[in-house]
Design a protein with these regions (language model features):
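A short alpha-helical cap/connector motif
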Residues: 1-104, 108-128, 132-213
Length: 213
């Protein structure tokens, strides 16, 4: 089973990796994403760039650096504010980190994900945000329009109209929830047309169950 603990993004992320060919930016290193991406791109010419602001945490992964994997330290604290989030964007700009087909946002603090989302919205083909419910619940990205609770496990529906053209919020099956919120994963694109995005969503939904076997 590919999904363990808080790695609830993995089914959707893995299917996106399988259906894209370009480079990947990972904001926030972790066992649930870094190793999976490396395994998938092994033997290809795809490049993974991993960014992390926690130097101690980053040190757990720096030994992985190779021709296909670049790891960089973002000089930013963990204060959850726009100023901190913008330091991530400043690092990206200063290091000319461009040309990513897939951007995965799982960094800390929350506003680092928001600022990187804004920056890559019209640059990356597919953006994936883990723990996405935090953002509409706090009116940071879109808004929450419906909450459904089953056995103290909550799913939300969100409205991102005017924020991003194509989006889908994915939840694990209830029995694979971690805690009360899932957590959910947003897959979105401002670059793909509706037909292409809907095809990607159908592929993910068709194969999702296989990750829980």
């Amino acid at each position: 089973m590919l999904v363990q603990g808080f790695y609830t993004h993995r089914p959707y992320f893995k299917e996106i990796l399988k259906n894209t060919t370009g480079n990947i930016l990972e904001c926030g290193c972790g066992e649930g994403s870094t190793m999976m991406i490396r395994e998938h791109i092994r033997g290809t010419d795809r490049i993974l760039v991993s960014l992390e602001s926690n130097l101690e945490w980053l040190s757990k992964y720096t030994h992985l650096a190779d021709a296909n994997h670049v790891l960089q330290h973002v000089i930013a604290d963990n204060e959850d504010c726009v100023k901190t989030g913008n330091k991530w964007v400043e690092h990206i700009e200063a290091n000319q980190l461009t040309n990513f087909e897939v951007v995965f946002l799982d960094s800390s603090p929350w506003m680092s994900r928001k600022c990187c989302f804004d920056y890559f919205l019209d640059k990356a083909k597919v953006i994936i945000i883990h723990d996405f419910d935090y953002f509409p619940n706090n009116n940071i990205i879109g808004k929450t329009i419906l909450r459904t609770c089953v056995d103290n496990k909550e799913k939300i529906e969100c409205d991102l109209t005017g924020v991003v053209k194509n989006y889908k919020l994915f939840y694990p099956p209830y029995k694979h929830f971690v805690g009360t919120t899932g957590p959910p994963t947003l897959v979105c694109s401002n670059i793909m047309d509706h037909e292409e995005f809907d095809t990607l969503v159908r592929i993910i939904q068709t194969n999702e169950a296989s990750y829980y076997v």
